[in-house]
């Protein structure tokens, strides 16, 4: 069974394209003047499930003194929800040049923090206090962003939540005299290309707006209220039963892919998660049964359909006893049900539940396991290599996953796992210090040991400021 499970996960990781983003496509031919896309991600802090900041503007600074604005409309972004994944924030035309830094104007931080000592877990919300509101932060790039005429460049920004929110020696959030959480944003920014491993959009989900099958494209209402055109081609992988010709609203769709020069996204993968308008998505905090013996899950709700928006940023307990459809994101093969079902929902997982919402009652019909990120430090001396990059290592995580496991988390890797800023599993085996690591993939129960383990498509050495 262990061998079968491992094979199924290798197949799953390959199909999801979370190994190294190898399903890249050539940019389209409809070039505009030089353009820049912006993606955001985060490095999570334990038990913080929501960390929103309003980005008032993002400005590129050219080495000759000129500037170019890539975001001018205030946009509220919850970086904690990204869970180590990359989401598109902006796309704009700029003057060709060599840009050496970016200035971010931030405002209105809000923090949602889970208290796992309560039963059920309780949610605390804090207003954050910046050094000044709004706060302006200029970040130098490790190397210049060179934007050529008719070219396309990317700006990757990462908010380090661990360092941005002040905590005491016990890990509790520090409040000022007004009861506000002290926030000093720590941002890492770098120039990237759409073809780079860290230039790929890995977390884009939204509602289907329209489909143009003749043009091999559709429009998605993505995060932050922006509509994005998604292009597909013969290399785009759809989940089973779906293609550009039978897409129709209502539908909630997941996409991974790369920006093109015209601002559209060339999709390497398209997943129709559900054709239902009602859904919730977030982190599992507790799994158990109610008084009737029905299986129920308690989760922090990060996203919902338009009809359930009042549930956002709340903790809800949902009866899932009648659910029979269990899926894994961007994975649709005969092994799916062997990997994820009602017996394998675990604390810390990121899941999506689709169903109906009538008279304020949510009736779930399907559950999908989503990709997620996990931050921690290497447990030195606990690295096993089976063959090449196939093996595992232990990661010390003081967040929800570490809480669920009750100690270091086993991270399984494969020869399709992409090691970013690392040479591979052999480097981890030779490390003598507890270096920080970010893993991205799936959190699942091992069917042999019964323990919760992480199955990584990406292992990265996070940027250090």
Predicted regions and their residues:
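A short, solvent-exposed, low-complexity linear motif enriched for acidic/polar residues
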Residues: 21-308, 314-384, 399-403, 408-465
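C-terminal motif of bacterial Sec signal peptides marking the signal peptidase cleavage site
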Residues: 16-19
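Short helix-loop boundary/capping segments
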Residues: 387-391
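Bacterial N-terminal signal peptides that target proteins for export
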Residues: 1-8
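Hydrophobic helical h-region of N-terminal Sec-dependent signal peptides
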Residues: 9-14
